[in-house]
Each structure stands twice: as C-alpha cells, then as structure tokens.
C-alpha cells in the first residue's frame, strides 16, 4: 500500500512537471510554532497560519518542491493541479467567472446603467502595460456623469491578483451590482455615486485565470516566462518593501517576487491606476481566511502612532463582517505600496475559507463582506482634502504632501492628482505641520489641527513658481533736485509687464494670493501709476534682458530732505489671480539735502 501510494505520488509529480502545474501537499499533523513559522514564511499556504491542523501547502515542481520535502519530509502529496474547467462532478460551478465572463458582466452593467457606468482598459493608462499574454486589464467605473472625469475623490476595489482565487471577483462584481442598483433607492449609495469616482477591477491577473480554467486550478501567479518555468507572484512584486520578507528568489516558487520591483505588467498597470486617480481608499480582495490584513508587513513595522491609526480603520472594516485581523504574509504587497507611494488608505481582505468553494458559499460570503465595504466607502473620510495649484494660471500640480512631526520610516509620501491637483491626507488626531511641495515651485507649510476623524478639513494651496530672484538696483545720491536711476531685473520674465511703484512704508504691506507684498497701499503708491515727471518709465514691458530702467526725479524742495521712500519692482502677469507674478525686495531711498 505504501509502495502504491508513493508510485501514484511519483506519477502525479511527473505529470505536474510535464504540464507545469502546481502540487498540493498536506501536513498530516499540527506543527510546533517554530516549524510552523518556517513553513508560513517560506511557502504558499492554503490556511492563515503554519500551525493550523490539516494544512495544505502549494508548490511548483522543481526546486521549491525539493525544498519542502527536504525540510518537511512528513508532508503528503494530495494531487496536482488540473483544469478547473474539467473538474467533476460538482464544479466548475456556473457562477464562477472566466475572464471573458467578467468582461461580459462589465458590459452588462454599462448597458443597464449607461449614465453611471463605463468600461476602461487600464492597460492604456500612462505607465501601464498589457499582460505577458497580450491581454487588457478591465475596470468598471461608477459615478454620476461617468463619461467625464470630474473633480471628485476616487475609490478603488480590486480582486484576483492571485489567479486561483475564483471567489474574489464575485465580491467586486457584487459591490458594483449593489451600488448601481441601490443608488436609486438608497440615499447613502446615491451620495456615494454622486460624490465619488469608484473604480472596480474584478481581475488583475487575466493570464493566470485563463491558466486556472484551462490547465491548473491551483495556479497562483501570472504567466511570465522564466525560462524553465512560469510566473511571478503579483502580490510580492510591488516596490514597497520588495524582497524584505515572505517572498522567494526561486523562479518556480509560488511566492517568486519577480526579477525587480514592479517588473510585471499587471503590477505596473495597477500602480498606473493609483497614480492616475490617487484614490482615497483602496481595498484588495483575496482568499482565503476571513481576515483583514494590516497594511504593513511584519518586517517593516510602522510607528506606534500610525499603527494605532490604521488599526482604527482596519477594525471598522472587519467588524461588520466579523472577520479577524492579521499581519500580511510578506512585504511587496499592493496595499502597503499604494499607502506608501500615494497616501491611499489601503487594506487587503481574505474572504471565505477556500479559493474555489461551492458557489453557494461564495454567494453567502459576498453578503457577509458587503457591509464592511459599504462602511468603508460611505463613512471613511480623510483628515484633509483640497487641491494644489500653481499660482501661475491656477493650473493643477502633482505635488507631494508631508507633515511633521514625521511618523514614517519607510519612505511614505502623499501625492496629489495630476489632472486636477486633488489630494487627501489621512492624519491621526493631533497638531501637525503640513507641507505641500511641487517641482518648480516654492513649498508652502501651515499648521493643521485634526480634532476628529472622518470630518475633512478643506485646504486648497496655491504654490508660487520658483525663479531666479528679482532684484532692484539704485544709482544716484538721492539729493533734492537730482535724478535717481532704478533698475528692475527679473530673469526669465521677458515680455511681461512691470511696475516700479513708490511707498512710504513696507508694513503691513498688501495681501496677494496668500503672499504679502512688502509695500503699503498708501497715496504715494497709488500715485505711482501716473507720477510723471517725478517718476518716469516706471510702467511698461520688460526688455529682452528681462530688465526695466526707471528714473526718480527728486523735486528740488529742501523740505523733502530726510523723507524715506520705498521703491518696489513688480512683474505683472495676468495668469496670476492678482495679476502680479513676483517682486524684488523693496529698496529704501532717503532724500538728501
């Protein structure tokens, strides 16, 4: 009997190697914690913990299988992967989606709700790419006025980074159905659709899913050709913490992280989506375990402040579903990357207790998961929302937004959206110094007090373009009855207007677009618009050298001796809200007897 079992196992293994399919092994007894930890951090498990009884371990034929058998010789081969489309007698369940059926379902939503739903090929976004199998990755966008890109926050819900997790797309498609069908009768969902842009991505890994249906129901990875084997674990391929823990360099491994961060087209496409829409919330659906994962991998722990802050939202997500919480299995996962690179509040949900349970169980699981998703989408709100724009033309900027005291240690950064400058900041309660920065512009900082959660402060910021500083040069003694030469230089401002005014003081100045022009708006300044012949050539167009020369003819009035005039130089530009682009620091001229 033992010989027969070994022979069957050998045949299955040989067949798996020939077909490139996955092997499932069973651990026949419960491991002690130390061995369980090794198993959990090295291999792909069908359960949440390496110490659970009756544990399934999935490996590819070759080096990974050899490593498993060397370290855990007690494991028993269950079977190799087979085409999911050929499994009998009860599955394939007609409820599970092939990639073609997912696209068909998206099209049905669009046909039924043309004003609120549209299909988008994510691989056409800047920085995205078609899969190794030359496939698109499709999204359903839900919003009012869905044909246009409105200035409103975004949410992303995605599934099936791992191909075999056939129950995960049903949660995304179920959410789409609930939102679209419920918006007409549910005021909360109506507000969600009116105020947000919701991106639903049922399948991130179409090549892998096709392989599940046609060849191997255990298949996890994408279909990169590694030479002697195939596939990269997409949820180990993201740049945040790439290779730090929980992934493998063995190409045949179920958790092979790929040759480099974001090497895979599917990863590139999802990162392109995040960069394009800068969502406030990202939720990733996986299976299985009935858990919500912490955002940070255990090898890259956050500060205590950020950990407690994220736990608040994790608990808000899992409680309506009665799910547990746990650490991620590895670094390089999507939620950590989207939080780290964009400031998007991100979590991963492991649904159900199997990858492909009877479809009736998946239907019930979607019902169980929806209240958590609904709570996240309709109640979670960032601490601060707003826009970052350039003062020149009020054009939107893709800016970085940071704050102090710094609570981050892994390169985390928040970014605004390029198309409209919209940003969102998720901040713990407290007093913070927030700084907005963009290339070619001066940074701006201000104090922000976060007194309550999910009650956003509205802060729009206009940044001043940087340039070589403008200067003023004064020539002449300033004696009564003499002329004083005034040269205003504003490098780069060729052809723009200029104004060289006078004022009797510099404080409190004039408030312009959040800036302070250090000249008082007194009668002398007003008269500077038409003070000829006392002030000549002080209003005009900057020359080809970005300079202007004006003349102050000091009246021959002895009583003026001792009076101090403050001379300014301003560049005029109608693309700025105030019409004033910049100025040189004012220079004082004291009239001499």
Regions found by a protein language model. Name each.
Residues 168-212:
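Short helix-loop-beta-strand segments that form the rim/entrance of peptidase-like active sites
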Residues 439-464:
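Structured interaction patches on ligand/partner-binding surfaces of diverse proteins
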Residues 421-425, 457-459, 548-552:
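Short strand-edge motifs at loop-to-beta-strand transitions and within beta-strands
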Residues 213-390, 397-398:
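Metallocarboxypeptidase
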Residues 429-440:
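A short, solvent-exposed beta-strand micro-motif common in secreted/extracellular proteins
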Residues 395-428:
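Short, acidic Ser/Thr/Gly-rich low-complexity loop/linker segments typical of extracellular
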Residues 19-90, 514-518:
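Extreme N-terminal flexible tails
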């Amino acid at each position: 009997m033992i010989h027969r079992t070994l022979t069957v196992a050998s045949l299955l293994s040989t067949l798996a190697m020939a077909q490139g399919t996955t092997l499932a092994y069973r651990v026949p007894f419960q491991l002690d914690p130390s061995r369980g930890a090794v198993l959990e951090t090295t291999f792909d498990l069908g359960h949440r913990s390496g110490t659970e009884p009756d544990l399934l371990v999935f490996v590819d034929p070759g080096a990974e299988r050899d490593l498993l058998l060397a370290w855990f010789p007690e494991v028993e081969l269950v079977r190799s992967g087979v085409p999911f489309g050929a499994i009998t007698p009860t599955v394939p369940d007609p409820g599970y989606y092939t990639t073609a059926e997912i696209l068909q379902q998206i099209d049905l939503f669009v046909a039924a709700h043309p004003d609120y739903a549209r299909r988008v090929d994510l691989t056409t976004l800047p920085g995205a790419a078609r899969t190794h199998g030359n496939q698109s990755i499709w999204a359903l966008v839900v919003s009012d006025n869905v044909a246009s890109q409105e200035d409103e926050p975004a949410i992303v819900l995605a599934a099936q980074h791992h191909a075999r997790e056939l129950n995960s797309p049903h949660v995304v498609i179920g959410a789409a159905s609930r939102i679209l069908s419920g918006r007409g009768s549910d005021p909360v969902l109506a507000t969600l659709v009116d105020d947000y842009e919701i991106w639903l991505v049922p399948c991130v890994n179409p090549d892998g899913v096709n392989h599940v249906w046609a060849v191997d129901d255990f298949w996890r990875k994408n279909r990169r050709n590694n030479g002697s084997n195939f596939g990269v674990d997409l949820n180990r391929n993201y740049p945040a913490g790439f290779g730090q823990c929980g992934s493998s360099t063995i190409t045949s491994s179920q958790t092979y992280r790929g040759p480099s961060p974001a090497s895979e087209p599917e990863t590139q496409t999802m990162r392109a989506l995040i960069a394009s829409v800068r969502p406030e919330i990202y939720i990733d659906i996986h299976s299985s375990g009935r858990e919500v994962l912490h955002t940070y991998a255990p090898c890259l722990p956050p500060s205590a402040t950020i950990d407690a802050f994220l736990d608040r939202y994790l608990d808000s997500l899992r409680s309506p579903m009665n799910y547990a919480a746990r650490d991620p299995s590895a670094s390089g996962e999507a939620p950590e990357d989207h939080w780290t690179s964009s400031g998007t509040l991100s979590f991963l949900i492991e649904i159900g207790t199997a990858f492909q349970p009877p479809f009736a169980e998946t239907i019930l699981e979607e019902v169980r998961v929806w209240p958590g998703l609904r709570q996240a989408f309709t109640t979670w709100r960032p601490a601060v929302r707003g826009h970052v724009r350039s003062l020149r033309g009020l054009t939107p900027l893709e800016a970085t937004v940071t704050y102090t005291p710094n609570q981050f240690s892994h390169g985390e950064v928040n970014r605004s959206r390029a198309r409209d400058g919209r940003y969102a900041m998720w901040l713990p309660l407290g007093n913070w110094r927030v700084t907005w920065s963009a290339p070619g512009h001066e940074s701006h900082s201000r104090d922000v007090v976060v007194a309550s959660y999910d009650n956003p402060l509205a802060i729009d910021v206009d940044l001043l373009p940087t340039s070589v500083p403008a200067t003023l040069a004064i020539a002449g003694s300033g004696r009564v009855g003499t002329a004083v030469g005034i040269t205003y230089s504003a490098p780069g401002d060729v052809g723009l207007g200029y104004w060289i005014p006078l004022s009797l003081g510099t404080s409190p100045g004039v408030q312009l677009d959040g800036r302070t022009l250090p000249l008082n708006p007194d009668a002398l300044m007003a008269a500077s618009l038409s003070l000829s012949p006392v002030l000549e050539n002080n209003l005009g167009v900057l020359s080809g050298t970005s300079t202007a020369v004006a003349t102050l003819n000091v009246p021959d009035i002895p009583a003026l001796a001792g009076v101090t005039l403050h001379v300014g130089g301003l560049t005029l530009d109608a693309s700025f809200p105030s019409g004033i682009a910049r100025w040189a620091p004012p220079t004082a001229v004291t009239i001499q007897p």
